[in-house]
Amino acid sequence: MCKRRKNPYKGLSNFVGGKIEENENGLDAAYRELEEETTISRNDIILSHLMDFTYHLGNCYLEVYVGKLNRAINVSGDENELYWTTLDNDFFDVTKYAGEGNIGHIMMHVKMYQEELLK
């Protein structure tokens, strides 16, 4: 997770991520953003596509990927403060987590399908 240093959601915890670049698919963008923001590379993790969100009024499409590390890693990044967390936090707490409850919704599905997703 990252603690955002800028708006939106300054001071709140969020997932790392970013925009899909031209001629790039969502999975490649997820790996690229993960490495840029945390130093976690394709060699360290296999990502799986979990879900998508479409915000029609904001013309925004969000792809969500999840993965399990294949080794212990110390994350580092310049953009935001990074930290590891456990799956048992209250990710619906909007005083701690960005996204108006979306992180809670996403993490609820990660927990529901963790045996399949995080094998």
Task: Report each predicted region and the residues it spans.
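Active-site segment of metal-dependent pyrophosphate-handling enzymes
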Residues: T39-I73
